[in-house]
From Swiss-Prot:
Source species: Aliivibrio fischeri (strain ATCC 700601 / ES114) (Vibrio fischeri)
Family in the record: Belongs to the bacterial ribosomal protein bL9 family.
Protein origin, superkingdom: Bacteria
UniProt GO BP: translation
Gene: rplI
NCBIfam families: L9
Identification of the protein by name: Large ribosomal subunit protein bL9
Keywords: Ribonucleoprotein, Ribosomal protein, RNA-binding, rRNA-binding
InterPro entries assigned to the protein according to its UniProt record, in alphabetical order: Ribosomal_bL9, Ribosomal_bL9/RNase_H1_N, Ribosomal_bL9_bac/chp, Ribosomal_bL9_C, Ribosomal_bL9_C_sf, Ribosomal_bL9_N, Ribosomal_bL9_N_sf
PANTHER family, alphabetized: 50S RIBOSOMAL PROTEIN L9
Length: 149
């Protein structure tokens, strides 16, 4: 299925590219999220007339993400959790806990933006957590996990 991308999408293309994707991916993900439109003749003409406006929107989103990245990079968050001997936590600290702690500290982060490639945190200590604010913008959050009294 031919679609026109309205945003930069990793491993697929950037704004304005006409790409061929599977029908289900287009129908269930790209089109409902406003990241693409079907490549009909009318949509191609509509896109060409709105191209400057869409490029400005993408640039604005990128600038906003970079501004948030500056705040996240400067942020240090501490989470207290119950733990046993040798620093093992009872339970774990996941993406939702990290997002809520960062939001409480003053920087709005969604749990879908938190990247934990090795899974949830299960020990006390200092961690650097990757935050993906935009397809091109990553930030690093300094996280300290301490034992709760």
């Amino acid at each position: 299925m031919q679609v026109i991308l309205l945003d930069k999408i990793g491993n697929l293309g950037s704004l304005g590219d006409q790409v061929n994707v599977k029908a289900g991916y287009a129908r269930n993900f790209l089109i409902p999220q406003g990241k693409a439109v079907m490549a009909t003749k009318a949509n191609v003409e509509m896109f060409e007339t709105r191209r400057a406006e869409l490029e400005a929107n993408v640039a604005k989103q990128l600038a906003a993400a970079e501004a948030r990245a500056e705040k996240v990079n400067a942020l240090e968050v501490t989470i207290a959790s119950k733990s046993g001997d040798e620093g093992k936590l009872f339970g774990s600290i996941g993406t939702r806990d990290i997002a809520e702690a960062a939001t409480a500290a003053g920087v709005e982060i969604a749990k879908s933006e938190v990247r934990l490639p090795e899974g949830a945190l299960r020990t006390t200590g200092s961690f650097e957590v990757s935050i993906q604010l935009h397809s091109e913008v990553f930030a690093t959050l300094k996280l300290e996990v301490v034992a709760a009294e």
